[in-house]
């Protein structure tokens, strides 16, 4: 697979074209951002940890019948993925109250949400990824009702699979965000799944093991990521 020019550079990943029109190379960098890119730092080993973590999770989801963008690992920091037409909507599933939900509704952090909630956000850094609803998605043509229904179904299926996986590792899956795209007309899970895009707490102590350690200045960010990977059995 020939790596060609950079197609897109995000806050923590870069995307490159290849000699296959249906495949891209995803590079995980050491950049770590918070507050819609207003704060960015370099954290040693982060790119490699997230690349391998993402590969592990995506393979688990594929095995559970959820189609993903992931194809194969290419190096410590690169993987080969399907080229998707991305839908500009983030799907967020919450099992416990945290983050923006706490700020928006004034509820106590850590309250269990039964059943889990499903939320939508427009993927737009300039606007701060605003909270939207299903009517907005349909009215502005970001996805069809059928596509949105499939995204919601897959989101809850991801929650079911990963809740069990993390619980067995002594972790609580507090919440997570997913992005989807179209591959030859079919809805496919895209982007990544790593501690950058979810909240994970130790089941016993409630210690935060995700990017909130960076956002809140708690320190030992990569050490926490590596501990999560170790508990799951991710080969680093």
From Swiss-Prot:
Pathway: Purine metabolism; IMP biosynthesis via de novo pathway; 5-amino-1-(5-phospho-D-ribosyl)imidazole-4-carboxamide from 5-amino-1-(5-phospho-D-ribosyl)imidazole-4-carboxylate: step 1/2. One of its GO terms (biological process) is cobalamin biosynthetic process. The keyword Ligase applies. InterPro entries: SAICAR_synt/ADE2_N (IPR028923), SAICAR_synt_PurC (IPR033934), SAICAR_synth (IPR001636), SAICAR_synthetase (IPR050089), SAICAR_synthetase_CS (IPR018236). Disulfide bonds: none annotated. Pfam families: SAICAR_synt. Keywords: ATP-binding, Ligase, Nucleotide-binding, Purine biosynthesis. It is an enzyme of class 6 (ligase). Its EC number is 6.3.2.6. PANTHER family: MULTIFUNCTIONAL PROTEIN ADE2, SI:DKEY-6E2.2. Belongs to the SAICAR synthetase family. This is Phosphoribosylaminoimidazole-succinocarboxamide synthase. It comes from Pseudomonas paraeruginosa (strain DSM 24068 / PA7).
